Amino acid sequence: MQKLAVYVYIYLFMLISVDPVALDDGSQPTENAEKDGLCNACTWRQNTKSSRIEAIKIQILSKLRLEQAPNISRDVIKQLLPKAPPLQELIDQYDVQRDDSSDGSLEDDDYHATTETIITMPTESDFLVQMEGKPKCCFFKFSSKIQYNKVVKAQLWIYLRQVQKPTTVFVQILRLIKPMKDGPRYTGIRSLKLDMNPGTGIWQSIDVKTVLQNWLKQPESNLGIEIKAFDENGRDLAVTFPGPGEDGLNPFLEVRVTDTPKRSRRDFGLDCDEHSTESRCCRYPLTVDFEAFGWDWIIAPKRYKANYCSEECEFVFLQKYPHTHLVHQANPRGSAGPCCTPTKMSPINMLYFNGKEQIIYGKIPAMVVDRCGCS
């Protein structure tokens, strides 16, 4: 009799605890429950999406070894951005991201960005300032990323002003050296002869790989270079210090370094959209817009598809993770269960200004979620 009273008490308590709507007949409770479930799922995904965007901002700065986003305005960027063929190629033919499933993986990617191309603008050195008869250009400071990587290509780009009639231009690149008493101040690097036609000016590239490698071996020997480009009448056509209307025509160095390919790991996962009712772990679309952050220092891409993982990992779906399942069986209360996380990620290529106003083209690993799974 006492047991019966206990059962009745429990039953009454359950009736009181249940929402009154749930006791009515009809389809309305089911519809409300489904709507509530969808609403909760949308809220959860929205929170996950916001967290993912904030995490991406932190990861980009960390992987680029930047303590904070470079403070470069759009006006300054217009002045610094070279109007040169190699840079225009990177922007015009920009590969925002690779959808190839064999490209990179979370386990095999390094954490920090892999530099592929560095565009270095000229600066003034103390040696150039102290010289009598200031040379026409240029001193280049090199990033530590160049010093610790193998250089596969190094080109000096110079812009030659337009000519009014067909003419031959004599280009000479000289390397500055410390003079011994009355000795020479320069040694030749490259000399070439160009035939120019009337019209707009042209960009000319010159191979300086050997010189750069010597500078990297002996940094103290890097005192700068001088650029000369005279036509038949002795007019200097090289833009070394841009005048009015010559923004973006500075000489610059384009340096390419090796990039070690990464092995990938194949996996399978679910893909969903924002209207999906899928409750299992799934990959959802997410576009990151750098312009919305005010990150003008990122030249390209202005936005990219990052994606994110969301929803649940139930133990009933864990045949793929026997170790996790066994842990749960052994200690069901102590196990927090698996989480829906990226199981495969791929890099993005990025063209950006670093804190020293150098233009870097590199690969940032693990920035695009390719697949999601429970782990």
UniProtKB/Swiss-Prot annotation:
Alphabetical list of CDD domains matching this protein: TGF_beta_GDF8
Protein name as catalogued: Growth/differentiation factor 8
Assembly and binders: Homodimer; disulfide-linked.
Phylogenetic lineage: Eukaryota, Metazoa, Chordata, Craniata, Vertebrata
Species this protein is from: Anas platyrhynchos (Mallard)
The keyword Disulfide bond is assigned to this record: yes
Keywords attached to this entry: Cleavage on pair of basic residues, Cytokine, Disulfide bond, Glycoprotein, Growth factor, Secreted, Signal
Glycosylation site list: N71
Role: Acts specifically as a negative regulator of skeletal muscle growth.
Family: Belongs to the TGF-beta family.
Annotated GO CC locations: extracellular space
Keyword Cell inner membrane applies: no
Signal peptide feature range: 1-23
PROSITE patterns, A to Z: TGF_BETA_2
Propeptide stretch(es), residue numbers: 24-266
Disulfide bonds: C272-C282, C281-C340, C309-C372, C313-C374
One MF annotation (Gene Ontology) recorded for this entry: cytokine activity
Gene Ontology biological process terms from the UniProt entry: muscle cell proliferation; negative regulation of myoblast proliferation; negative regulation of satellite cell differentiation; negative regulation of skeletal muscle satellite cell proliferation
Record's subcellular location: Secreted
Top-level taxonomic group: Eukaryota
